[in-house]
């Protein structure tokens, strides 16, 4: 929140998004208040990013049980939107009860509403989700979807059924789901070696971001056409050979998951992303300094405008 408040004060037009806030670490009302405060500071430019994280982080770092991530996410979204409408919050879900039932506390809780007036009564919510049930819920309820290890070629096979299921239940008055993907950007001849910068992060998530038996990122990578590689990377990483795990990341994946290469190649990747359903780009720019990164941003914008 501190960093987002700073950015809100220093900018005028860009959307200020929270990244991915784990739903277990804050109450739904606090998540709603955080987004409402940011929306006020930014004059209506906030986006609330939410995710369930995973059991190793929630239980190992936060000391909380990792239970019912999809159902909890659904309830959090419902409560946040109730708060933003400045209704007296009353919610009796399976995981959140507001006010707290009298037999579980002092009995003094009563329905309350947000004192401040948000700029908007429906702040956009982006959900980071990967599994079938969570992606379906995202397509049904959220405003935007933040996938990981997205490649245009595998997207429909991995997530298509879930997206169609969720979109079939989506409220008619909510705008179509905004799908974010893209990766690192470096447009020009001879840029291909910059793809290797993604190896450490990819190896960490595929190999070590979760237990061997429950690593969501490894599952997605495997389903994306890299089943053998996913197992090798995980084995190497968990054995402590991180360098070998990084080297085992397929060059083919690094090319498909980024926008790095000659202008023609990047334009082809943009077409592929659009055809797979991507509606917004989630990217980072390569460059030695701010000027180089700004130039890459301008290059990408020109290519997008030319599609």
What is each stretch, according to the model?
Residues 1-307:
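Active-site-adjacent structural elements that line small-molecule/cofactor binding pockets in enzymes
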């Amino acid at each position: 929140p501190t960093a987002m408040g700073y950015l809100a004060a220093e900018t005028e037009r860009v959307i200020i998004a929270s990244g991915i806030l784990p739903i277990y670490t804050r109450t739904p009302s606090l998540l709603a208040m955080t987004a409402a405060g940011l929306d006020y500071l930014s004059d209506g430019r906030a986006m609330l990013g939410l995710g369930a994280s995973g059991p190793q982080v929630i239980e190992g770092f936060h000391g909380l049980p990792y239970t019912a991530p999809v159902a909890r996410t659904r309830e959090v979204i419902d409560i946040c939107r109730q708060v933003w409408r400045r209704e007296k919050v009353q919610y009796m879900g399976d995981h959140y009860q507001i006010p707290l039932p009298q037999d579980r506390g002092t009995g003094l809780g009563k329905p309350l509403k947000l004192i401040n007036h948000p700029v908007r009564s429906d702040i956009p919510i982006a959900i980071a989700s990967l599994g079938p049930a969570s992606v379906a819920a995202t397509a049904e309820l959220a405003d935007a979807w933040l996938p990981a290890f997205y490649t245009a070629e595998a997207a429909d096979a991995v997530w298509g059924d879930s997206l169609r299921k969720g979109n079939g239940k989506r409220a008619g008055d909510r705008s179509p789901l905004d799908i974010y993907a893209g990766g690192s950007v470096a447009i020009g001849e001879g840029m291909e070696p910059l793809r290797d910068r993604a190896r450490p992060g990819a190896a960490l998530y595929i190999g070590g971001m979760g237990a061997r038996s429950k690593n969501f990122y490894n599952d997605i990578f495997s389903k994306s056409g890299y089943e053998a590689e996913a197992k090798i990377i995980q084995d190497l990483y968990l054995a402590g050979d991180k360098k070998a795990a990084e080297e085992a990341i397929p060059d083919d994946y690094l090319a498909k998951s980024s926008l790095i290469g000659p202008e023609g190649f990047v334009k082809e990747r943009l077409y592929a992303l659009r055809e797979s359903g991507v509606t917004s780009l989630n990217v980072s720019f390569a460059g030695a300094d701010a000027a180089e990164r700004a130039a890459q941003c301008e290059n990408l914008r020109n290519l997008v405008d030319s599609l």
